[in-house]
Amino acid sequence: HADGVFTSDYSRLLGQLSARKYLESLIXXXXXXXXXXXXXXXXXHSDALFTDTYTRLRKQMAMKKYLNSVLN
């Protein structure tokens, strides 16, 4: 009887540990995916800001060049 109780309790404990590991892996995977998505969104946002700033700079340079050619 004692062996059966021990085996049953031990099996339950292993099941709980497996479930805990599985949940922790899901949580870590979800956190990593959220961090990757946030990093990708931040990278895309940074790229867009760079492109916007670069486009403005090019327009300003073109305007200066045009004004220089008209005024001189």
From Swiss-Prot:
GO MF annotation terms: neuropeptide hormone activity; peptide hormone receptor binding; type 1 vasoactive intestinal polypeptide receptor binding
Modification sites for Asparagine amide: N72
Gene Ontology biological-process entries: adenylate cyclase-activating G protein-coupled receptor signaling pathway; epinephrine secretion; positive regulation of protein catabolic process; regulation of protein localization
Annotated keywords: Amidation, Cleavage on pair of basic residues, Hormone, Secreted
Keyword Secreted: yes
Stored Pfam families: Hormone_2
GO cellular component, as recorded: extracellular region; neuron projection
Primary location recorded for the protein, binned into one broad class: secreted
List of residues that carry Isoleucine amide: I27
Annotated localization: Secreted
PANTHER family found in the cross-reference section: GLUCAGON-FAMILY NEUROPEPTIDE (PTHR11213), VIP PEPTIDES (PTHR11213:SF5)
Stated family: Belongs to the glucagon family.
Comment field (misc): X's at positions 28 to 44 were included by homology with the human precursor sequence.
Name the UniProt record assigns to this protein: VIP peptides
Organism of this sequence: Cavia porcellus
Gene that encodes it: VIP
